[in-house]
């Protein structure tokens, strides 16, 4: 059994337990504003990888499911208040979140990216891939020193209540002007309009626009 199958089994098992508690219907919360994980089409219908995966898993365990739209910054409070039974919304597993809610085994990985507009003075910044910020060591220190120097005084934008915000507020990248937004779309719009010098998000959050230049740094490195 490969890792992906083990992961999906873990998610299925979690939903099966929920289904036994709430036999009528399993309600799953998602943001609907974080493509390609979850978003909405022109008609307002929820779509995306996690929406499709949720319905597939529910069919597999023979349960009826309803996908519930929820603003990102209220996702965990809404889960705690039992507005829905589970969350599938591109949520990273962190120690802080585990104090409030339980997680199944993760079902996907993503990398984070610093993005700037083409022509930015940050475009050629050296940010090597594969640096694990949780391990420490000279490689990490060198990378953080590079980031600290390059981002000093810059306006850095990210979505609120994310691991990206936590990283930027940790002090590891020195003194920056941090701006946070309710949705990723707002981050992208302000980056494109010049109100942000650089943005930090999952790399896939920037792939819809050819105007962005990626300065890659894996998400799992900055939890």
Residue ranges and their predicted role:
Residues 1-9:
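Bacterial N-terminal signal peptides that target proteins for export
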Residues 10-16:
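Bacterial N-terminal signal peptides
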Residues 18-23:
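Sec/Tat signal peptide C-region and signal peptidase I cleavage site
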Residues 24-91, 99, 180-181:
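Extracytoplasmic small-molecule ligand-binding "clamshell" domains
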Residues 31-33, 70-73, 91-93, 108, ...:
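Solvent-exposed coil/turn segments that connect beta secondary-structure elements
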Residues 55-60, 68-69, 73-87, 100-102, ...:
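Short helices/loops that flank or line small-molecule/ion binding pockets
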Residues 92, 99, 103-156, 161:
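A conserved helix-loop-strand patch within extracytoplasmic ligand-binding domains
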Residues 213-219:
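Conserved small/polar residues in nucleotide/adenosyl-binding loops
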């Amino acid at each position: 059994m490969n890792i992906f199958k083990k992961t999906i089994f873990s998610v299925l098992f979690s939903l099966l337990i929920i289904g036994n508690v709430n036999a009528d219907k399993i309600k799953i919360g998602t943001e609907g504003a974080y493509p390609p994980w979850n978003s909405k089409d022109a008609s307002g219908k929820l779509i995306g990888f996690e929406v499709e995966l949720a319905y597939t898993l529910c069919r597999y365990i023979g349960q009826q499911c309803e996908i519930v739209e929820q603003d990102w910054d209220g996702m965990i409070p809404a889960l705690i208040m039992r507005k829905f039974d589970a969350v599938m919304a591109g949520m990273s597993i962190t120690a802080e979140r585990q104090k409030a809610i339980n997680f199944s085994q993760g079902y996907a990985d993503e990398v984070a990216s610093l993005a700037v507009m083409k022509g930015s003075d940050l475009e050629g910044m050296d940010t090597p891939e594969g640096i694990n910020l949780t391990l420490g060591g000279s490689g990490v220190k060198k990378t953080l020193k590079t980031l600290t120097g390059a981002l000093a005084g810059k306006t850095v934008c990210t979505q609120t209540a994310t691991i990206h915000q936590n990283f930027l507020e940790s002090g590891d990248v020195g003194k920056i002007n941090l701006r946070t937004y309710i949705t990723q779309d707002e981050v992208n719009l302000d980056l494109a309009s010049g109100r942000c010098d650089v943005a930090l998000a999952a790399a896939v959050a920037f792939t819809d626009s050819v105007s962005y230049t990626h300065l890659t740094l894996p998400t799992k490195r900055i939890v």
